[in-house]
Each structure stands twice: as structure tokens, then as C-alpha cells.
């Protein structure tokens, strides 16, 4: 398969661009990772998991009396913004603190750890029980509502976001000869 772009390897060209433009790369990574993962979360019932329709849940929280369309559009906007903000936080703060090794595998591991452990736990421990289902007593990750499948789905969703984020936000080492 020919993956050449302008005489350079397309994957390497992307990594050079990411390294030279960390903020722009984080924004793009957040947009793309967020959209892909959000679609997969909505399609989770296809593999026997509960749907994670974060845009609808977010929109219903923002405007509980709005129509389905208003809730979805508002939720998609704010959920998409969340995905971008968390990608920026990852790229600018967490990524540099998680070690100096910047191989594709290590970059992927960093993103998966960040998204699954930190973001997944925030979602399961706080957002789902105290924001999206406030007052229903559903417990950690909705364990009293959807059982283990809902908790698993929350962590699976965040792992998928991390995989997408790590695949896209994949810089080179700052001393890489390609950067000169």
C-alpha cells in the first residue's frame, strides 16, 4: 500500500505536524476522537451493551424541557466541546507528565490511561450518578440501574476515546531529526 504524501510517509508527516502544532493537533484529535467514539457509544446495543448517547444525556441535562432535537443539538455541541477540551488537557498537561518516551505504542498507552482511568472514572463516579441521573440513586456508573453492563460500557467508551486520541495525537520526540 502506498502511503506517500508529498514524498514523505503519510504517517510520519502527520506525526511531524502534530509535534510542530500541538494545540491544533489536540483540537483535531479531540474533534475526530469524540465524534467517532460518540457514534460507537450510540451503537453499543449492537454488541449487547447499553447505548451511551452522551449528546442526548448532556442536552437533556442542559435543557430538560427542550425538544429532542434541541436537546440533541445542544448536547452534541457541548459534548463535542468536552472532547476537545479533554484532548487539549491531555496534550498540554498530562501527556508531558506521563514520561518522555514518545513511540506510537507509548503515545497510545498514555491516551488510554488518561481517558480510561481519569475520564472514565469521572464519568462513572460523578457524571452518570450525580448529573445525568441525579436523584435516582443509581450508584457508581449506574450499577443499580444498568448493572455491570453500564459500568463496563462507560469504561469501554472511554477506552475507545483513548485509542482514537492516541492514534491521532501521536507526536515525535522533540529531538527527532525530522523536525529540523
Where do the protein language model's features map onto the residues?
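Juxtamembrane/disordered regions of integral membrane proteins
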Residues: 2-180
Amino acid at each position: 500500500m502506498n502511503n506517500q504524501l508529498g514524498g514523505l510517509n503519510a504517517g510520519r508527516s502527520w506525526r511531524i505536524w502534530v509535534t510542530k502544532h500541538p494545540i491544533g493537533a489536540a483540537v483535531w484529535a479531540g474533534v475526530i476522537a469524540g465524534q467517532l467514539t460518540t457514534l460507537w457509544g450510540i451503537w453499543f446495543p449492537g454488541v449487547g451493551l447499553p447505548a451511551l448517547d452522551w449528546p442526548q444525556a448532556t442536552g437533556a441535562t442542559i435543557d430538560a424541557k427542550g425538544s429532542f432535537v434541541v436537546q440533541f443539538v445542544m448536547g452534541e455541541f457541548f459534548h463535542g466541546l468536552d472532547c476537545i477540551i479533554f484532548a487539549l488537557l491531555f496534550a498540554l498537561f498530562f501527556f508531558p507528565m506521563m514520561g518522555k518516551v514518545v513511540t506510537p505504542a507509548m503515545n497510545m498507552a498514555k491516551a488510554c490511561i488518561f481517558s480510561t482511568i481519569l475520564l472514565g472514572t469521572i464519568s462513572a463516579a460523578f457524571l452518570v450518578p450525580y448529573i445525568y441521573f441525579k436523584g435516582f440513586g443509581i450508584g457508581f456508573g449506574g450499577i443499580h440501574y444498568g448493572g455491570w453492563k453500564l459500568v463496563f460500557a462507560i469504561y469501554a467508551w472511554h477506552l475507545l476515546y483513548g485509542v482514537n486520541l492516541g492514534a491521532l495525537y501521536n507526536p515525535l520526540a522533540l529531538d527527532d531529526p525530522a523536525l529540523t
